[in-house]
Regions:
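Cleaved targeting-peptide boundary
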Residues: 25-35
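Bacterial N-terminal signal peptides
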Residues: 11-19
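Short pre-active-site segment immediately N-terminal to the catalytic Zn-binding motif
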Residues: 116-133
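Cleavable N-terminal signal peptides
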Residues: 13-14, 24, 132
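Metalloprotease/metallohydrolase-associated module, dominated by Zn2+-dependent proteases
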Residues: 151-229
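Bacterial N-terminal signal peptides that target proteins for export
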Residues: 2-12
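Auxiliary, metal-adjacent structural segments of Zn-dependent hydrolase domains
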Residues: 27-28, 39, 43-112
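Catalytic Zn2+-binding segment of zinc metalloproteases
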Residues: 137-154
Length: 229
């Protein structure tokens, strides 16, 4: 699909960038190219590597992993609300060991298996966790905008001109040019309270295309594929 169509076929919607230390465990025989590689992440994403990859059922499953558990209290309501909507849609969230993530990755949403994976090494700061959960949750909502989460397509939700310039510039400095439209609005959502929550609720209700006007090219694609009249 061409970039101008504002639909992106991809296997991975990558998360925030940050330097990553290396880990090791001897029993991941499915991984042939070492830890902290795309190969290692792929093994996790398709659920062939599950050691130290734990499903998150509430914020406490994450906050209890760290000494500063009480510092997570202010984000509990929004986090748990997003998690609930993700689960309603069919998306699971996992907290995973750093060895499964390539260098510069804090988290990932997988558009094929529809799961979110959070890098345990960096989730000890509540604001980082919340930004990442919103960011990857927005990618899930983009998946929904493209017709259904049961495909490997994502579509932008907001008109590009509505995205504040600061987030577009940040995306341009961080991601390949072809990914900027999707990542710019995900950066925006990552730092905006309830923006992702609202989109996930819309997806769960089945009102995505009435709550948010599809872009012209997305609308054309949705009509061609029978999602809207």
């Amino acid at each position: 699909m061409e970039h101008s169509h504002k639909l992106l076929k991809q296997v991975i919607a990558a998360g925030f960038a940050l330097g990553l230390a290396h880990g090791a465990l001897a029993n991941e025989d499915k991984i042939t190219k070492g830890y902290n590689s795309m190969d290692a992440m792929g093994c996790m994403l398709v659920r062939e590597c599950t050691n130290d990859v734990e499903e998150v059922y509430s914020l406490l499953d994450i906050s209890s992993q760290y000494d500063n558990t009480e510092e997570f209290t202010p984000i509990a309501h929004e986090f748990n609300a997003m998690l609930l909507e993700m689960n309603r849609i069919g998306i699971k969230v996992y907290l995973a060991d750093q060895r499964y993530f390539p260098i510069m990755h804090r988290g990932v949403y997988h558009t094929v298996t529809n799961n979110v994976y959070l890098n345990k090494k960096y989730m000890d700061e509540p604001h980082v966790l919340m930004q990442l959960m919103r960011h990857e949750g927005w990618h899930a909502a983009q998946d929904c905008m493209a017709g259904t989460i049961n495909n490997s397509m994502i579509a932008i939700i907001k008109p590009e001109e509505d995205v504040p310039m600061i987030w577009r510039v940040m995306a341009e400095r961080t991601y390949p040019a072809s990914a900027v439209p999707w990542e710019a609005e995900a950066q925006w959502a990552g730092r905006t309270q309830n923006m992702t929550q609202d989109a996930l609720e819309s997806c769960a209700r089945g009102t995505m295309w009435t709550d948010y006007d599809p872009t012209p090219m997305t609308g054309e694609w949705l009509r061609e594929n029978g999602y809207i009249d």
